[in-house]
Amino acid sequence: VQKDGTVIDTIKVTIGDMEKDYVSYTCKGELLDMKGVQIPKNVYNYDIVVKKDDKVYKNLSLTRWSEGTSGYSFSALPGTYQFYYGENKIAEITVTDSDVVQDLTMPVKYIKIKMYDAQDQLIPLTQQVTLINQESSQQYNLYGDEDSVDFSIAVALPLGTYQFETYEGMPSVQGKTITVKEDTDEIVMNMNVYKLTGNCKINGESADRSTWINLYRKEETSYLTSCAVDEEGNYVFYLESGDYSVQVSKADATIIAEEEVSVTNASVIQDFDITNAS
């Protein structure tokens, strides 16, 4: 017998009529970090297994893209349920004859990361950020929030030391580490980088997301990173001092423009106004 895609009972069918009633209730709550702080939905990336009678009753996949508001919710029959996050049992909830509201305390710490460039300007991390836990080698793909104004990115992670793997907008962040501690609410990182930004127009119109900006180190002629322009044709990188080659290419990798840029001790603007591009 299933309800909302969840197996709630198994019955044996024999000869003759059978009737069995089920009364279910709602079990719901918010997700809290280990200090009792409510975890915002935009940092969710959790798979929680709910068991009943030593069997999997429900798999809760909670991400920033999940439907509804924050927290968890599912239909439950009367009984006792155990909640697991990885190998950790994080809660046990008993449903009797009414709805249950109980928050789940996750074995993670919610922290805001503030990253500043060499001119003490906050760097917004709006693209995917990849972190690797140095003890477990577990990879975490995180996403910044474009509406964030007082921090670069927020995370809710298990305690430990993490290494930045990739961030296409700032190549030099790779290899940097942060340590998530229970008594830490904020991490400040001072990066020796400067902002390179610009706008790209093609035949008088703002370039679309099929247009890519490719970055090379001039002295090494080696590929460094790339990004697609946004809806208005804008792009942004955060770079260490040096000389760079900036290329504009189409989705098929055809190069339609190229400029050389020197990043010294200030932010740089490099716009492109490309004509006769098909």
Regions found by a protein language model. Give the residues of each.
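A short, amphipathic beta-strand motif
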Residues: 27-33, 111-117, 196-202, 272, ...
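A short beta-turn/strand-edge loop motif at beta-sheet boundaries
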Residues: 36-44, 120-125, 204-209
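Beta-strand signatures of extracellular beta-sandwich domains
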Residues: 47-49, 128-130, 212-216, 247
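Short, acidic Ser/Thr/Gly-rich low-complexity loop/linker segments typical of extracellular
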Residues: 51-71, 132-153, 217-234
